[in-house]
Amino acid sequence: MEAVIKVISSACKTYCGKISPSKKEIGAMLSLLQKEGLLMSPSDLYSPGSWDPITAALSQRAMVLGKSGELKTWGLVLGALKAAREEQVTSEQAKFWLGLGGGRVSPPGPECIEKPATERRIDKGEEVGETTAQRDAKMAPEKMATPKTVGTSCYQCGTATGCNCATASAPPPPYVGSGLYPSLAGVGEQQGQGGDTPWGAEQPRAEPGHAGLAPGPALTDWARIREELASTGPPVVAMPVVIKTEGPAWTPLEPKLITRLADTVRTKGLRSPITMAEVEALMSSPLLPHDVTNLMRVILGPAPYALWMDAWGVQLQTVIAAATRDPRHPANGQGRGERTNLDRLKGLADGMVGNPQGQAALLRPGELVAITASALQAFREVARLAEPAGPWADITQGPSESFVDFANRLIKAVEGSDLPPSARAPVIIDCFRQKSQPDIQQLIRAAPSTLTTPGEIIKYVLDRQKIAPLTDQGIAAAMSSAIQPLVMAVVNRERDGQTGSGGRARGLCYTCGSPGHYQAQCPKKRKSGNSRERCQLCDGMGHNAKQCRRRDGNQGQRPGKGLSSGSWPVSEQPAVSLAMTMEHKDRPLVRVILTNTGSHPVKQRSVYITALLDSGADITIISEEDWPTDWPVMEAANPQIHGIGGGIPMRKSRDMIEVGVINRDGSLERPLLLFPAVAMVRGSILGRDCLQGLGLRLTNLIGRATVLTVALHLAIPLKWKPDHTPVWIDQWPLPEGKLVALTQLVEKELQLGHIEPSLSCWNTPVFVIRKASGSYRLLHDLRAVNAKLVPFGAVQQGAPVLSALPRGWPLMVLDLKDCFFSIPLAEQDREAFAFTLPSVNNQAPARRFQWKVLPQGMTCSPTICQLVVGQVLEPLRLKHPSLRMLHYMDDLLLAASSHDGLEAAGEEVISTLERAGFTISPDKIQREPGVQYLGYKLGSTYVAPVGLVAEPRIATLWDVQKLVGSLQWLRPALGIPPRLMGPFYEQLRGSDPNEAREWNLDMKMAWREIVQLSTTAALERWDPALPLEGAVARCEQGAIGVLGQGLSTHPRPCLWLFSTQPTKAFTAWLEVLTLLITKLRASAVRTFGKEVDILLLPACFREDLPLPEGILLALRGFAGKIRSSDTPSIFDIARPLHVSLKVRVTDHPVPGPTAFTDASSSTHKGVVVWREGPRWEIKEIADLGASVQQLEARAVAMALLLWPTTPTNVVTDSAFVAKMLLKMGQEGVPSTAAAFILEDALSQRSAMAAVLHVRSHSEVPGFFTEGNDVADSQATFQAYPLREAKDLHTALHIGPRALSKACNISMQQAREVVQTCPHCNSAPALEAGVNPRGLGPLQIWQTDFTLEPRMAPRSWLAVTVDTASSAIVVTQHGRVTSVAAQHHWATAIAVLGRPKAIKTDNGSCFTSKSTREWLARWGIAHTTGIPGNSQGQAMVERANRLLKDKIRVLAEGDGFMKRIPTSKQGELLAKAMYALNHFERGENTKTPIQKHWRPTVLTEGPPVKIRIETGEWEKGWNVLVWGRGYAAVKNRDTDKVIWVPSRKVKPDVTQKDEVTKKDEASPLFAGISDWIPWEDEQEGLQGETASNKQERPGEDTLAANES
C-alpha cells in the first residue's frame, strides 16, 4: 500500500502541480475503495478497466451522502494516471514516427493499453531500471505494412513521395484526434541532427486536417490580427514574426482563426468547449515559442497570461526533467545533439531571443512538440483556475424555467467542473431526477430504464411535454403558426405584382386553393356534378350552400381546399372569424408604411410592407424579412412570443416607429407611434395594440389579452438585491368602516385594470386614510418591498430653471392624470406587489390582488415615470427641435415662438400621450396669461414664486428643517442673501427632530424681509437676442452671484447663485469668489446652453493686476468679456462688502516687538510674555471650559492686540495655531471658534503680523528657546492650596491622584477632598481587606444563584463555595426565593459544617427579613456585595462557570445535547459535585474535600511592610497567606489579621534576623520566596520552596483578583 501511495503521489505532483492531493488523502481514498470492494489490491488502480466503475461509484456516493472529498481526490489521481499513460504513448509514437525505434502504439484506452512490465513491477513496489538492451529493443523500428503517404518528404528515408518506410508524412499527435508533427526534417540540421535538407529548403507547417507545401515564404500577420481585435477589447501587444526568404519557411497562423478565437474567449469564456476546441485546432501542429507567446497574449488578459506563463514554465520543467533522465528523449534530438534546457524551450537561448528565424532553425522537432504540448496543457490549467466553474450541486430548476434552460445550465456547470469525464453523465442524470420541477421528476421516474444518457432523458421529457394540455395562449400561438403559409402566399403575390383586372390583386382559387387565379381560370376546374342543384343560401343554381361564395363574404371567392373560413388556415380546428368590422371595407391584408423616428443614421427612413390585421395577436410583430437591417433593435423585457410548444425569440425596436395604413385611394390613416416587436415570422402582423389607434372598431374580442396597451412595451424591469427572498407581512385588521371603504377602492382599481387577482407568495399590508373631502384614499405599505429593491439612479438632476424660457413665447401647461397608473409593471415583478383584502372574522377566504401598474410608494416609481414619459416624448423632441418642452415627473410645459405653433404642438403632444395610454385632464390644461408650473407663476416676461405664508408655525427642529428647505427652493428665484438665511441656519443645530424651537426675533425680522422681497422681486425670462451677463460680489456672511442681462444698466436677473457653507476652519474671500465664479459659469452652460458673454468682477481686481492665480484658474477657457466695476445696484439687498486683497500675516520676521504665547490643559491658562528691558512681562487668561486649542488661539489673539498699529512677531509652539494664522493671510470666512477668535484680532489690526513656530522644550540655546520656556513655565505654574484643590474638584470632579498632581498636595489630602464631595461618594469608601477569604475551612462562604437551562423546569442552581478549601455544594430549585436560599444553606451545613460568615450579593432572597432571622438562629454573620458585579463574588462566580461546564460535559457524554430529562437531573448533579470535590483541580495535589477536613496549619511567614493610606510603608507585619493579587498579613504586636492588595506589600529587609526559619514557614507563601533576601540560608530556602510548590493549596484555583 505504501509503495502504491508513493508512486501515485509522485505522479500527481508531476502532472497536477500545486493542486495535487496529499498522501493522506490518497491513502484514505484507497482504503475506501478496498472497503467498498472496488479494488482487490491497491495495484489494481493501474488497470484502466477499473477506472470507470470507481468513477461511477464515487459519483453516486457524492450525490447521496454529499461527501465529495474522495471524488475530488480520485479526479486528480485519475488525471495523473491518464497523463502518465498518454505521455508514455506519446513517447512511443514520437520515437516511432521520428524513425528512432519503438513499436507503433495504439491510442490510449482501457481496452487497448497493456501495462508494460516496468509498470507491473512498480505495482509491486520494486525499483526498476531500464537496461541498454531493453532500450535498444524498444527503440528499434518495427516492420509494418506500407502506409498511405502524402506528398511530403519522409522522416526516415527523405523520399519525396511514396516511400515504404513505416512512417507517415503527417505523424499522429500525442493526444488522440489532433495532428501534432509537421514536416520539419530539415529544421535544425546544422545543429547536428543528421538531416539532408539544405538550409534554404522550405518546409511547410502541417495545418489541421490537411498536409502539403506552404505557398512560399509567409509569416503570422500579428499586425492584422491586432487591427481586427482593436474593436473587440482584448489587449494585443504581440508583434509580427518576419521570416526572410533565405531562412526556413514557417506557415503563418490564419489571422481570421486567431480573431475568431479571441472573440470566442471574450464571449464564451476560457472553459467553454468551443474555446478549447478552437485552441486545440490552432495548436494541433508545433508552434515556435514566439508564436505561442504571441497567441496567448492575444487571447488572454494580463492576469490569465501571467498565470499561463507560470504554468507553461512548470510544464517545461517537467519536460526537462524527463529529458534529463533519458538522453534519447525526443527533446534531446534522440541523443544526437546537446541536451535541451529551459532557455531553448522558451526561445531565450543564443540566437533565439526576438529572432523567429533562429527559433525555426535551432529548435529540434522534439522540442517543438514539447513546447506546443506544454503550452496547451498550461492553457487548460489557466482555464480551470481563471474561470472556476459554479457548483453544479446547487443548481435547481426555477419555477418558471423551462427544462431545456435548466439542462443547459446544469450540463455547462458539470462539464466545467473537476469531475472526471466518465462521472459527468451519471451526475447529470441524477440531477435531472432530483433538481428538476416535480412534474418533470414524475416524467423521468416513469421513463423506461433503457434511457441511460442525458440526451435520451432530455428528448424523452421534451416529447412528453408536447402532449401536455393546451392553454388559451398555446392555441393562439398555434393559430399564429398555422396562418403563416396563407400570409406568405398573399405577401408573395403582392410582391410579385400578380393582379387582375382593374389592378386588384387576385385571390385564391375556389377549386385548387392556389393564388394568382380564380376558379374560372383554374386548369384543374371540374364540371359541376349536378348543375341543377339549388343553393339554400343564395337561391342560386349549380352549387349547394356549402359551396356558396356568399357564405364567407369574400366577393364570391371561397377559401381553397383545406382552409377554413376567416383568416385562419387551420385544418380540423374550430373556425375563428376576424373579431373586427372595418368601416372602410378594407381586406385583412393591408399596405403599411413604417417610418423610423429615431436619431440614428439609416439608409431609408420609410419602408412599405404588407401586414395582416389580426385581432388575435396581442402585439404588433414585424417580420425580420420586412425589417430594414440598419434599423436598430434591442433585447425585449419578454424575449419570447409564447404559445403551444414554447415560443419564438423576439426583439424590440430601439426607436419609436410610426405605423400608418395606406387606404385603397392612397390616403394615409392617422399614424400610430409604437415600439413593434421584430421576430422571425413569415409575415408582419398588426395586433390589438394598434388596431384601435388605426381607426378600427373591435367587436367580440376572442380570448383574453396578455398585454395591457402600447405602454407595456415601455415597462422597465426592476432590479432586485441578490437576497430578495419573498416578503410576507400579515395584513393588519381594519375596522368595518375602513374595510368597506377599502373594498370599494379595490373594486374600483380592479375595474380600471390597475390590479389583478393574485396567488403570489409576497404580501404587504394596505390601509385607507380619510381625505379632507371626506372620501378615502388607498395606501400600500411597501417599505419591506423597497428594502429588497435596488434603487434606480437619478435621471433628472433637479427641476428645470423656468427663467430660461425665451422671453415673450406663449406657454401651455399639461398635467398627466394618474401617471403612475398609466405605466404598467413588468410582468415578472408584479407578484412582489401583492396585498390581501381581508374579511371580518375570517368568515370567507381573503381575496388577494397584485398591482399591474406602478404602485404609489414604490421607491422606483418616480424614476420609471420620468423614463417612460420621456421616452414617449423623445420622438416629438426630435421632430420639433425648436419647441421648448419641459418635463418634470407628470407635469409638462410647452413653449413655442407663436400661438399657432404652440396649439399645433400641444395637440400633437396630447395625441401622442393618449395613444401611449396616458390621460390628459382637459380642465388642467393651462394657457396664458398666468400659468403656474412647479410652484411658480409665469408671465410673458417674468417668473415669480407663489405660496409664501404670512408667518410659519415653528415648534420643533423638524419644522425649522422644512422651512429652510422651502427657502432653499426659493433662493434662486428671489435672491435671498446669506444674512437673511443666517437666523434660520442657527436654529438647525441639534440632533433630535422633536427638539423644541421658538420663532425668535431674528427669525421674525428675516422672514419679514423675505416676504417683502417675494412681493417685489422676480426672475426675468431670458431674451436670446441680448448678451448673457454674470456678476459676483462679497456680502455679509457669504458671497452672491447672478446670471442675467443688462446688470450694469437695467438689471434683469435670470438666476441667483450663492456661495456654499464653508467646510474648512477658514476660507479666504478670494477662494470663495473663485468657487462662485466656477459655479456661475457651469450654471450658465447647464441652464442656458451657452457660456457667459460678459463677466462683472469686483473693483478690487481692477486695482490688483495681474489677476490672482485662483481667479485665473476659474476663468480658464473663458472667451467672453471681463469688466471690473463697482458693485451693481442689483446686489444692494445683500449689503455688499469691499474685498481686500491685502496680506495681513507672513511667516518671516518683521521689525517690531516679539511676544511668546503658550497654553496648558492642566491649568486651563493661556499666557503671553514679552521682554521689557531686563525683565519679562506677563499677560494671561484662564478659562476652565475652553479647549487647549482655543486657549492657544486666545493667547495669540491677545498678543496681536498688544500693538495693533505696529508690526509684531508672535512666537508660538502650537503648530495648529501657526498654520491657521498663515492661512488667514487675507480676509476670509471663519467657521470654527478658534478661527473666529483669530479673525476678530486680525480685523482690528492695521499693521503686518508675523507668526513664528518653535518646538517646545528644545535644548537649543538662544532667545527663542528662552522666551518659549518662560511662556511655558508661566502657563503650567500653579500654587493651589487646599481650598483651591477643593474648588478644582468642585468644578471638574477629578480623582484623588489627578488632584494630588495638579495641586501639589499629598494623596491623603486629595482623598479627603474627594471623600468630602457628596457627588463622588454616594457609597462609603472601602477599606483594604473588605473582601477577605477564609484562612481556614468554614470561615467564609460565598453563595449565589445561577441559571442552567438544561436543568429545566428546576433550572435555578444555588451554589456555595468555601473560600478556603474550594469545596462546592449545589442544590436545585424552581425559583429564586428566600425559602430556596435557606433550604440550600441547610443542605450545605449538613455536608460541610456550619460556617462563621456567608457573603452574597444583595438580592432580595438573601436580604429578606426571614433570611436574616434564619441566619441569626444559626449564628452566621452575613455580608453583601454588588449584584451582577464580580467584585466580592469572584470565587462563587467562577464556581458557577466551573459547575456549568461540568454539567454540560456530563450531559453530552450521556447523549443529552440540550435539555436533561427530569429523571436524570438529580443523578447528574450529584456526579458533578463528586467530580469537583473528590478529585484534584489543576496543579493542586489535594482535593477540595481533603483540604476541607484536613486543613494546613498556618504559621507566620517572613516580615513585610504594608502601604497605609497616607502613602507610607508600615512595619511590624508578617505574611500568613499569599494569594492571587492579595495577601493576608498579621500584626506582630496586636495579632490583627487583614487582607491587603499584593501591590501594597513588600519585604521588610530590616527584620531578617527575626524571620521565622524555613522549617516553620507556611507553604502558603512559598510563592514570595524569590524576593525575600535571606542571605544566610538562600540555597536551603530555595530548595524548600521548590518542594513546597507542589503542595500549594487548591484555593488558588478559585482565588479572586478582588479589589
UniProtKB/Swiss-Prot annotation:
Enzyme Commission numbers on file: 3.4.23.-, 2.7.7.49, 2.7.7.7, 3.1.26.4
Modification comment: Capsid protein p27: The cleavage at the C-terminus is slowly trimmed by the viral protease, sometimes being cut internally thereby generating the short version of the capsid protein and a capsid protein C-terminally extended by 3 amino acids in a ratio of 2:1.
Location of the active site: D614 (for protease activity)
Pfam families xref list: Gag_p24, IN_DBD_C, Integrase_Zn, Retro_M, rve, RVP, RVT_1, RVT_thumb
Keywords of this entry: Aspartyl protease, DNA integration, DNA recombination, DNA-binding, DNA-directed DNA polymerase, Endonuclease, Hydrolase, Magnesium, Metal-binding, Multifunctional enzyme, Nuclease, Nucleotidyltransferase, Protease, Repeat, RNA-binding, RNA-directed DNA polymerase, Transferase, Viral genome integration, Virion, Virus entry into host cell, Zinc, Zinc-finger
DNA-binding residues: 1502-1550
Binding site for Mg(2+) 1: D815, D890, D891
Span(s) of short sequence motif PPXY motif: 172-175
Site (Involved in capsid protein dimerization upon acidification) residue list: D418, D430
Basic and acidic residues: bias regions: 124-141
CDD domains attached to this UniProt entry: HIV_retropepsin_like, RT_Rtv
Residue window of motif Nuclear export signal: 219-229
A GO cellular-component term linked to this record: virion component
Domain Reverse transcriptase: 750-938
Region of interest: Involved in homooctamerization: 1548-1567
Molecular-function GO terms, alphabetical: aspartic-type endopeptidase activity; DNA binding; DNA-directed DNA polymerase activity; RNA stem-loop binding; RNA-directed DNA polymerase activity; RNA-DNA hybrid ribonuclease activity; zinc ion binding
Site (Cleavage): 155-156, 166-167, 177-178, 239-240, 476-477, 479-480, 488-489, 577-578, 708-709, 1280-1281, 1567-1568
Peptidase A2 domain ranges (all copies): 609-690
Binding site for Mg(2+) 2: D1158, E1192, D1213, D1272
Residues annotated for Zn(2+) binding in this entry: H1289, H1293, C1317, C1320
Domain RNase H type-1 as annotated: residue spans: 1149-1280
Annotated function: Capsid protein p27: Self-associates to form the irregular polyhedron core composed of hexamers and pentamers, that encapsulates the genomic RNA-nucleocapsid complex. Assembles as a tube in vitro. Binds to inositol hexakisphosphate (IP6), which allows the assembly of the polyhedral capsid.
Record's protein name: Gag-Pol polyprotein
